[in-house]
């Protein structure tokens, strides 16, 4: 019977961890991130759900003769914001799996 109490304690601990993980995930999804390129000439904002919420392009980089440069800056700023989301998500969610020897984690 002693093992049953231990099992119940583990189950409660797992349920608590699941709630904490769900809250952390919800907080991450709502968090706003900002990516930039060209020294701030292009800014892309996104939320943790990986949804782009805003793109700001400084008019100084709008050159009809060099659309490719503008495209590169938008792409770089977008990749910057997505990397920030990925890194923050890995760091935050990794706290929950650290120390657990779970396959695939």
From Swiss-Prot:
Residues 1-23 are annotated as: Disordered. It is found in: Cytoplasm, Nucleoid. GO terms for molecular function: DNA binding. Keywords: Cytoplasm, DNA-binding. GO terms for cellular component: bacterial nucleoid; cytosol. Residues 1-16 have a biased composition (Low complexity). The keyword Cell wall biogenesis/degradation does not apply. Belongs to the YbaB/EbfC family. Binds to DNA and alters its conformation. May be involved in regulation of gene expression, nucleoid organization and DNA protection. NCBIfam families: DNA_YbaB_EbfC. HAMAP family: DNA_YbaB_EbfC. This is Nucleoid-associated protein lin2851. It comes from Listeria innocua serovar 6a (strain ATCC BAA-680 / CLIP 11262).
